[in-house]
């Protein structure tokens, strides 16, 4: 069996209503040497199961019991035959040049570059362009990276995959910190080539957003060594100036120790909302990442 250059892996749990858009965007890719793997993560919705059964035979569908998003992504990576892998959700879409542009960069990059990512175009409850950047120091406090990035499969293997205990979200954030700790870095393509559907119940605005502080605390506990002062100073000195100052980082770490979890989580969530409102005020579809709420959304 021929080995493709890229594997596109798609976790799907009762998300059949979104698959037509994703499949159409995959079929429109200008780079053609890829395979598509959909991981049915214990779907129970009859319409989703019917949709999966009716897909083109060239799309490989693997079934498993519900292991949530990190477990489904790990299954997709294990099934992937290519050296380069992109995980996307079933309600996402890719611009036609996504694979062509990202694989060209990653193929030519040195081995320490483990991933390539693009900016995102948001649709649904939020609309606009979300800029994405990789600053190692900021990444310890803010989830800057999209989950939909082209990775070397060897990078996923080297850090042990996604943490399957993180069932409430932000597993991609914790995964990116392990990539950072492994000495891997990413390259940004400053174009919105990933189309990300935002729902009021989704990760960006829903449960995971409300638990942002709690999930960050989990990440910090898992990676205590990198959040110690000496390690933080080393990463801060090696990073370009970013969104988080050293003083702000120290303040967050101090508050996380002093405040009860519910208080800290509320503070963290409100800070994120203020930042989001500031971005929304900057306008719609702007290169600097302006966002606006879609009044026609179900939100």
How would you name each of these model-derived features?
Residues 97-129:
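Conserved donor NDP-sugar-binding/catalytic core segment of glycosyltransferases
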Residues 85:
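Short aromatic/hydrophobic "clamp" motif used to bind/position activated sugar donors
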Residues 1-25:
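N-proximal low-complexity "stem/linker" segments adjacent to membrane-targeting elements
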Residues 168-175:
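Acidic donor-binding loop at a coil-to-helix junction in glycosyltransferase catalytic cores
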Residues 64-80:
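Glycine-rich, basic loop-to-helix element that forms the pyrophosphate-binding segment
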Residues 23-63:
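Acidic donor-binding segment of Leloir-type glycosyltransferases
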Residues 4-7, 35, 174:
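Cell-envelope/extracellular polymer assembly enzymes that use nucleotide-activated donors
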Residues 130-139, 167-168, 184, 188-221:
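Nucleotide-sugar-dependent glycosyltransferase catalytic core
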């Amino acid at each position: 069996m021929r080995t493709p250059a890229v594997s596109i892996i798609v976790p799907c749990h009762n998300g059949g209503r979104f698959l037509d858009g994703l499949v159409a965007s995959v079929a429109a890719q200008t780079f053609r040497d890829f395979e598509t793997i959909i991981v049915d993560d214990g779907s129970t919705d009859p319409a989703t199961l019917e949709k999966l059964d009716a897909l083109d035979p060239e799309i490989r569908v693997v079934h498993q019991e519900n292991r949530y998003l990190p477990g489904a992504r790990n299954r997709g990576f294990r099934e992937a035959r290519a050296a380069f892998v992109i995980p996307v959700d079933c309600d996402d879409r890719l611009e036609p040049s996504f694979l062509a542009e990202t694989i060209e960069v990653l193929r030519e990059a040195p081995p320490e570059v483990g991933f390539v990512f693009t900016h995102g175009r948001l649709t649904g409850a939020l609309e606009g362009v979300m800029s994405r950047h990789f600053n190692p120091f900021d990444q310890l406090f803010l989830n800057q990276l999209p989950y939909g990035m082209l990775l070397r499969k060897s990078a996923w293997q080297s850090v042990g995959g996604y943490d399957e205990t993180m069932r409430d979200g932000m597993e991609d954030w914790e995964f990116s910190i392990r990539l950072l700790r492994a000495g891997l870095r990413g390259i940004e393509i400053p174009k919105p080539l990933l189309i990300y559907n935002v729902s009021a119940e989704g990760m960006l605005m829903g449960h995971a957003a409300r638990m942002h502080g709690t999930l960050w605390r989990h990440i910090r506990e898992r990676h205590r060594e990198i959040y110690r002062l000496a390690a933080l100073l080393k990463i801060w000195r090696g990073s370009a100036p970013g969104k988080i100052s050293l003083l702000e980082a120290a303040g967050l770490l101090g508050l996380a120790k002093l405040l009860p979890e519910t208080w800290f989580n509320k503070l963290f969530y409100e800070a994120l909302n203020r930042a989001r409102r500031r971005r929304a005020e900057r306008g719609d579809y702007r290169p600097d990442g302006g966002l606006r709420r879609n009044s026609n959304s179900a939100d």
